[in-house]
Design a protein with these regions (language model features):
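Intrinsically disordered, low-structural-confidence terminal and linker regions
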Residues: 1-40
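C-terminal extracytoplasmic interaction modules
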Residues: 1-2, 40-43, 48-137, 143-169, ...
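Conserved hydrophobic positions within beta-strands
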Residues: 175, 250, 518-520
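Polar, enzyme-active/binding microenvironments
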Residues: 246-268, 353-355
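Periplasmic N-terminal soluble interaction domains immediately after the signal peptide in Gram-negative
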Residues: 261, 270-278, 394
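Beta-strand/loop-dominated core regions that host nucleotide or nucleotide-derived cofactor-binding catalytic loops
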Residues: 282
Length: 590
């Protein structure tokens, strides 16, 4: 429903809420609905605990929206209930070192009031009570919508831009819970982004097994019998199982139901005791755990497989084309392999992939998409701001907790059912800070244990990025800025940008303009943008592609011309004759 500009007279900002719920399309007692009670006892066309649908097989679901505006609104807006009291948003925040963002959480507070039910109950005229004298809106809403968790709630802010243009900002979340009215008649709806809903990230990969051995399994046997295959979610034809401490591979194409109700599957050639485990005898009734397998997948493909196969997050919420573009540009050498035999929280696995490959993942409530971006320099034109013209309330601090002087990544596990100690891995990749290691007085180290990365050069890329970014204590900043009318300069989470301020000076006292990564954004009620960011200090080089078709269309000549003071951001590869594209002598790494 559109808010008309005439309703905004005297107000600069106007907030509304839309709750999207489910409802049956059918008319009570009319075919195909077979419910047969009288209309006074008709259902409320929703699935609920207390007054459920009376003909569940024919329940025909559709979406229905409920609209709310501010309780203090003096204009009557058709279809909007003036029950909204307050909206409190805790935005998603990216880890400073890259990885999976923390939860974004929104609390909507509503007042409650009696309600006539005229637009909610199709059978209101047949009821034996007067709706306005019986209960309240939220009490009845909650009783009629028992299964509202996961449904979408949209917070919309309509406002005038500084140029007088009417604009609207929508932020979409998913409902986690609705409280019962408290003693003051207030109801709280808690909503979160889809990355962090209980059913999404507390799901397990692989799922906890419900499968048992139907008969004992001897050493050397080339097939096994299962009591069922219920709950297996592997999309792979060649499925790996774990029984006890043995991993084994079966050929899904040999699936054969037996007369006794069991399921027979054949092992692949040499399919027993694989991946660092050994053959063993297994008793009847032993648990057969599906293994989630990832065979040399790109970062975006591995993440997509986790979301699509093991969570209820929909494919429409995944910005997979954006993921692919980032991975192709910056992490194309990373191919991930893992065999997960213990049910593990989805959030843990996504965090591992993001952290160990230096990519960031977060939910954008304005596009309703889960975004991914590599921790990398911005090769295009950086957004740039100053405290003289663009921002206010700037706070600056150095965060020594982020400093790193040594990063080690242990990789290639000796066994895929082993632990996460250094001795459980075959290889280690180490990057050291040789510039400032002992100058701070207390060198800081970090160890990563990766069951995803199998390439030492890729591991060294991650450890190198971390050292190059955090060998010096980075800046953490926060500031505010007005709403930007122009999308091309509007700051959003994940953006790289530069900030010029009197607070940043070099040793000569001249202006120093560092680069930052925006880790969090939130709009206030008055559309003031609150920003948190961490400095992007990069002392090493990312390899820049050869030729004019490099990332963002820039070659060596145009990049150097546009960024004369950006030395160290890119390490450009010379031509075959040893010169750079503009004729300069090539660089030497010493």
């Amino acid at each position: 429903m559109t808010i008309q500009a005439t309703l905004l007279a005297g107000a600069d900002v106007f907030g509304t809420v839309e709750i999207k719920a489910k409802k049956c399309l059918l008319t009570y007692g009319t075919s195909p609905c077979t419910a047969s009670l009288n209309d006074a006892q008709a259902c409320f066309k929703t699935r609920n605990v207390l007054n459920d649908c009376q003909d569940i097989p024919n329940y025909n679901e559709t979406n229905v929206s409920y609209f709310f505006c501010d309780e203090k609104n003096t204009e009557v807006i058709d279809g909007f209930r003036p029950l909204l009291k307050n909206v409190s948003i805790a935005p998603s925040k990216l880890p400073a070192r890259g990885g999976l963002a923390n939860v974004s959480k929104v609390k909507f507070t509503f007042i409650d009031e009696p309600d006539t039910d005229t637009d909610l109950d199709d059978n209101i005229l047949d009821r034996s009570y007067i709706a306005r004298e019986n209960g309240t809106f939220w009490g009845k809403f909650k009783a009629r919508n028992s299964f509202i968790q996961g449904q979408e709630i949209v917070y919309s802010v309509t406002f005038y831009q500084s140029n007088g243009t009417l604009s609207k900002l929508n932020q979409r979340y998913q409902i986690e819970s609705i409280s019962w009215p408290n003693k003051n008649g207030e109801v709280t709806i808690t909503a979160k982004d889809p990355l962090n809903l209980t059913d999404a990230l507390n799901a397990k990969c692989p799922p906890v097994s419900r499968i048992k051995l139907y008969s004992a399994l001897a050493v050397g046997t080339n097939h096994l019998f299962l009591d069922s295959v219920v709950g297996i979610k592997s999309p792979d034809n060649l499925t790996i199982f774990r029984i006890g401490d043995e991993l084994m591979e079966v050929d899904g194409s040999t699936y054969a139901p037996q007369p006794d109700g069991s399921i027979k599957l054949n092992f692949t050639a040499n399919g027993r005791g694989i991946l660092g485990t050994v053959h063993a005898v297994h008793e009847v009734g032993a648990t057969v755990q599906e293994v989630a397998r990832f065979d040399a997948l790109s970062i975006d493909a591995a993440l997509a497989k986790i979301f699509n196969s093991y969570t209820d997050v929909t494919s429409l919420q995944l910005d997979t084309s954006g993921w692919s573009a980032q991975v192709s540009a910056w992490r194309s050498s990373s191919f991930l392999t893992n065999y997960i035999s213990e049910p593990t929280d989805i959030k843990t696995l996504i965090s591992q992939i993001c952290d160990q490959n230096q990519v960031m993942m977060w939910y954008d409530p304005q596009t309703s998409k889960i975004k991914l971006k590599a921790v990398a320099p911005e090769l295009g034109t950086l957004k740039s701001y100053t405290d003289a013209n663009d921002i206010f309330d700037l706070q600056v601090a150095e965060d020594d907790t982020l400093r790193l002087n040594s990063v080690s990544m242990y990789l290639n596990p000796r066994s895929w059912i082993g632990g996460n100690k250094p001795s459980d891995f075959q290889d280690v990749a180490v990057s050291l800070d040789t510039l400032y290691y002992d100058l701070y007085g207390s060198p800081k180290e970090r160890n990563l244990y990766s069951r995803w990365i199998s390439s030492t050069p890729v591991a060294l890329s991650t450890t190198g990025v971390l050292i190059n970014r955090f060998r010096a204590s980075p800046f953490r900043i926060s500031f505010k800025m007005p709403y930007d009318n122009f999308p091309q300069t509007r700051l959003i989470t994940g953006d790289n940008f530069r900030l010029e301020t009197r607070q940043f000076q070099n040793a000569t006292g001249s202006s120093y303009v560092p680069e930052f990564i925006c880790v969090s954004t939130k709009y206030d009620k008055d559309m003031t943008l609150n920003v948190e960011a961490v400095s992007y200090s990069y002392f090493g080089g990312n390899n820049g592609p050869i030729g004019a078709t490099s990332f963002d269309g820039q070659d060596y000549s145009t990049y150097i011309a546009a960024n004369p003071n950006a030395g160290g951001i890119l390490a450009w590869i010379s031509q075959a004759d040893g010169t750079m594209l503009n004729g300069d002598d090539s660089y030497y790494i010493t």
